[in-house]
UniProtKB/Swiss-Prot annotation:
HAMAP family from the UniProt entry: Ribosomal_bL9
Protein's name according to its UniProt entry: Large ribosomal subunit protein bL9
PROSITE patterns reported for this sequence: RIBOSOMAL_L9 (PS00651)
Annotated organism of origin: Cupriavidus necator (strain ATCC 17699 / DSM 428 / KCTC 22496 / NCIMB 10442 / H16 / Stanier 337)
Record-level GO cellular component terms: ribonucleoprotein complex; ribosome
Record's keyword annotation contains Transport: no
GO MF terms held by the record: rRNA binding; structural constituent of ribosome
Length: 150
């Protein structure tokens, strides 16, 4: 299916690109999420009329994400979990826990924005974690996991 991207989509393209994707991906994810439209002649004409407005909105989102990223970069978050004698946690610290801890410090984040390349944290100590505020703005945050003795 041919679609017009209404915003930047990772591994697909930028605003205004006409790309071919599988039907299910377009119907179930891109079009309902307002990330794309079908590339018909009328849709292309309507998009060209609204292009400046959409580019301005995308630039505003990027500027807001960069401002938030400046506040967030280099930040350290402390999370307490029950742990054993050897420093391993009973359970783990997930991206939802980190998003909740950052929300406690005044940052509105979804758990999907917290990127943990090595999976959930299972050891006491300091761990680097990436936070994706925008497709172009990724900030590193340090998560300090403190063990509570049982």
């Amino acid at each position: 299916m041919q679609i017009i991207l209404l915003e930047k989509v990772i591994n697909l393209g930028n605003l205004g690109d006409i790309v071919k994707v599988k039907d299910g991906y377009a119907r179930n994810f891109l079009i309902p999420g307002k990330k794309a439209r079908r590339a018909t002649q009328t849709a292309i004409a309507e998009f060209e009329v609204k292009r400046a407005e959409l580019e301005k909105a995308a630039a505003e989102k990027l500027a807001a994400a960069q401002a938030e990223g400046e506040k967030l970069s280099g930040l350290s978050v402390q999370i307490s979990q029950k742990s054993g004698v050897d420093g391993r946690l009973f359970g783990s610290v997930t991206n939802a826990d980190i998003a909740e801890a950052l929300a406690g410090q005044g940052f509105k984040l979804e758990k999907a924005q917290v990127r943990m390349p090595n999976g959930p944290l299972k050891m006491v100590g300091d761990h680097p974690v990436s936070v994706a505020l925008h497709t172009d703005v990724v900030v590193d945050v340090t998560v300090s996991v403190v063990g509570e003795s049982v």
